[in-house]
Amino acid sequence: MKVTDVKVRKINGESRLRGVSSITFENQFVVNDIRIIEGERGIFIAMPSRKTSKGNFRDIAHPINSETRQIIENCIKTKYQDLLDNPPQEEDFSQNSEN
């Protein structure tokens, strides 16, 4: 499956959570709430999950093989790094005195 879109939202704060991402495949299927986490060995990607009644976490959606996982991780990490290197410009909505 071809990745056709990746969106990343940076999270500022003191937790290890650095951002949240969504990834779209073939303009037909999207996976939301992929977490970007700062671990002891750098950034890692955590697929969306839910907590079970026993306190364990189970992925809601995840890649079936390591090749697909690598593609997803590379796309998200690249987009996240691009966001860090080129933060979006804040728009100025102040009144223009020339009006």
Swiss-Prot record:
The keyword Cell cycle applies. InterPro entries: SpoVG, SpoVG_sf. GO terms for biological process: division septum assembly; sporulation resulting in formation of a cellular spore. Keywords: Cell cycle, Cell division, Septation. It comes from the Bacteria. Gene3D superfamilies: Stage V sporulation protein G. Signal peptide: none annotated. The keyword Cell cycle applies. Could be involved in septation. Belongs to the SpoVG family. This is Putative septation protein SpoVG. The lineage of its organism: Bacteria, Bacillati, Mycoplasmatota, Mollicutes, Acholeplasmatales. The gene is spoVG.
